[in-house]
Each structure stands twice: as structure tokens, then as C-alpha cells.
Amino acid sequence: VNWRRIVWLLALVTLPTLAEETPLQLALRGAQHDQLYQLSSSGVTKVSALPDTLTTPLGSLWKLYVYAWLEDTHQPEQPYQCRGNSPEEVYCCQAGESITRDTALVRSCGLYFAPQRLHIGADVWGQYWQQRQAPAWLASLPTLKPETSVTVKSLLDSLATLPAQNKAQEILLDVVLDEAKIGVASMLGSRVRVKTWSWFADDEQEIRQGGFAGWLTDGTPLWVTGSGTSKTVLTRYATVLNRVLPVPTQVASGQCVEVELFARYPLKKITAEKSTTAVKPGVLNGRYRVTFANGNHITFVSHGETTLLTEKGKLKLQSHLDREEYVARVLDREAKSTPPEAAKAMTVAIRTFLQQNANREGDCLTIPDSSAMQRVSASPATTGARMMTAWTQDLIYAGDPVHYHGSRATEGTLSWRQATVQAGQGERYDQILAFAYPDNSLSRWGAPRSTCQLLPKAKAWLAKKMPQWRGMLQGETGYNEPDVFAVCRLVSGFPYTDRQQKRLFIRNFFTLQDRLDLTHEYLHLAFDGYPTGLDENYIETLTRQLLMD
């Protein structure tokens, strides 16, 4: 009898019991009552009403309340200066740099929000929150600490009525977009706007628990906790949270877009759908028929957002739309709401094109409805288009100019036809975007910035070397030369490869070591999906063979 084998098999059988997964808990405010979900990494294991007695430590959430007070009372900005004196500055900035309010909230810089530094008095604080019927723990400045335990229900109550929450929601999208949280934006899109938190799960302060709390894009409060830090909770459970969290279909950005419908086609007459009498200029409500000067016609629906105007004797249709409704209508006109991943990518491209090309008149963006810009449906967006748009609300792909086309695929141009093929192959929306726009980065509307500081000389060197290496590398099992990629400057840490975005991060491009790093990371990308792509010894040996030959 092979006793070693029997012991090994018994260990495998008992292993799941010994290392049983602690379920993730998700509290979500509902229309009738709050619900508590228990989730494993594979799905929902239990759903029940949220107990009034369930508690949570505040952890880093106290900073969100200080942020809300600062914003709502219009306190002047007081940047925190990092001097290298405190280990807590690792969450804030490098020595010699400073950090402002919005960034401090995203990075969870407690030193910035310290009430003593900001000269927040306990009396002023208490009066402010008591006037807003806040929970007792929130109105007491001395108890606003990470270790303070509060009921989850009272936490959701406070989030539902939190002052300045629209501003907080806008800023907290950056938490999901943090590149260190790999795969989170890919799985969740922009649907959650949350402040992360971590604290200790035991009195000995040896076991960590973490999670996040905040809102869905429609303002629904939520709270999450699980074992580990907030970062591990987000990355580990992003996939199952994607399946559980609802996608709102009535979401507004608060920003208006003025669109001249049918801008390139002269209008002859507009009538009610079942009438031959021309309607008079003014706000339109109902179903209408447009007859063009060339004899063609089309019907459309208006619920008061479209106005018939006359300018210099010519008819003109002007629609006043919310930005997200505009994106959804363009999706209906230029593409479709399926397959979902292709549609999500398209909404990001549409929104980015709008930001890069629209003009401004007062508080509104202005853009014509034309094939030279973006074509937009004259009727309200379909439910499917609104869902895809809500899934990516506020997301743009910042960097180089963005274009798209029904069938043509070139660098800098997303092909809808190719995007549908990529979606069918299992690629997610951010991978489709990275293929079309390799030098751009997923970002938010209010802060369009590319996280890739391009190293064009490094990319040009690699592009020149790839044909020279091809003969040798094609003999290696698993080699698949990437079609597109970007080479980016590494701000800190060690060189690495972002396989999803097809990006190679290196420190610089001056020395032999830089070329070794670039080649090494390129090979990780070229062997992605094959075991050798994860074998550091194999990759390093091959790197030196390529550069030393």
C-alpha cells in the first residue's frame, strides 16, 4: 500500500473544509427593504433581509464623511504636504509633493482628512450633522474613527442622504479605474462609486477584513465586506459582483448636449405621423414624420426634448439631450446594443468622440447629427442601448483622437464589425478598446488622462526587432506575435506586462538593461495564454538569447 499517496489524497479531500471560503457580504438598499447577499467566488449562496443588528467597523469610511463636510460647507482647499515624516504618507504622496482633497479621497489619505489638521471643531461638526438627522455616531467627531462599530443599516442611511454625494460619486470612479486593481473596471464598468475600507477582524489585530461602501450610479447605497484587504476583495469578487449588481437604465449625467438633427439633409416639412398638415415651430410631443427636400421621409418620437425651429426661412430640428441619452441614441444609430462587450466598447468610443469634438454653448455641448461627426437617433434610445450606456457611464478612453467605423479597422479606429468578432471570441470591452486605441487609457469624463506615458523610441526599436526575431521565435511553442501594443514609462516598482491592455511598462529606454526589460516584457505578452509565458526562467533565457546573438 502506498501510504504516502493515501495521505496525500486524504489531504486533498479535507483541504476545502480546512480552507473554506469566507463568504463576501453585500448589503444593498432596495425599494421596499434592504437586502443582504452572501457571495462565494462562484455566485450567490444566500439572500435575506438585512438584519438591523449587523455591524461593521468604519475603517477608512470616516474620510468620506469629512470629505462631504468639506465640500458641502465650501471649505477652501488645504493641500497636505508630504515631507517623509510619517509612514502613513505612503497612501498620500511622495516626499516633496502635495495632495489635494479629491485625490486624497481616492487614495484614502488619512493625514489629509485629519480633523485636527483641518481645524474642524467638535461642536460645529455635531451641529452640522444633527441638523441633517444623521446617526449619533456620525454627529460625534471623537467617535469618527476606523475602529468605531456601526450598524450597516445606519451606514446605508447616512450614504442615502450624504451631502455632496454627486461630487463624491464622480471622484470615486477613480477607485475602480486604479490600474493596481486589475480586472475591476473590466468586470464592473463604472457602475460602482465606492470608498474602500480595511480594518481588523479580530481583537489581536492579526486578521484583516475589508470592502467598500458607496453607491451605484443611480444613487443606490451599498456596503461590502470580506476577508482580506479592500483591494483583494474588489479583485477577487469583481466577476460575481458583476452578475449580482443591477444595471440602471434611467441614469443622467446632468450635462446637456444640443444636437441639430439631420444636419446635412434640408427639411421640407414636419407633420404629425397621421396627418398631412405641417406642424408649427415649437416644442414637439408625440410621433412625427419628417419629409426631406430630396423626397425621402422618416418618422420619429419626441417627448418634449426636440424643438422645431426656423432659421432664415429654413426648418431645423434641435434636440436637447442628457449626455448619456445622447450616447445611447448614437449607439442605436451607429451600431447595436448586442453583443454586449462590443456595445460597451462602442459607448466609450462614442462618449470619447463627443468630448474630443463637441463645441460648447453655455453649459451645453453642441454637435451636429451627421456622418462627418456622429449620427444620432431622433427617437428616444432603446432600453438595450441605455443599459449598455449606463454600464459605462462617464467612461472615456483618454489619449489620442478616437474614431470608429462600421467595417474598417486601423490603429486609432474601432471597427464595429471587428468588435463584434472580438466579443464573440470572449474579449471584454476594455480589451476591444485597447486593440483599437493602444496608446489610450480608460479614464473618466471629468479627468481625461492617459495612464500610459508613451515611450515612442522604445516601441520603434521593438517594432524594428520583431521581424528579425520572428524566425527564431516562431519555432517556440506558444509564440503569438501581438498585433498591437504600447510601451509605457513605469512610474515606480518593477517592469511588468499588462496583458489585458497589451502594455509593456519599463523604467526608461537608455541602457542595455532597459532593452533587456523591454524584450523580457514583450515575450511575456507574446507567450500570453501559454504556460511558458509565466515561466520567468524560460522568458529570461530567451530574452538574453535574442539580445546577445
Protein language model regions, located:
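Catalytic zinc-binding patch centered on the HExxH motif and its immediate surroundings
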Residues: 31-38, 478-512
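Catalytic Zn2+-binding segment of zinc metalloproteases
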Residues: 73-74, 522-538
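A short, well-structured edge-of-sheet supersecondary motif
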Residues: 20-49, 212-217, 221-225, 484-486
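Conserved, single-site charged/polar hotspot
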Residues: 19, 171-193, 197-209, 213, ...
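Active-site-adjacent helix/loop patches that line small-molecule binding or acyl-intermediate pockets
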Residues: 22-24, 80-171
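Short alpha-helical catalytic segment bearing the HExxH-like zincin motif
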Residues: 56, 60, 513-525
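Active-site SXXK
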Residues: 55-78, 104, 260-264
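Short pre-active-site segment immediately N-terminal to the catalytic Zn-binding motif
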Residues: 502-518, 528-534
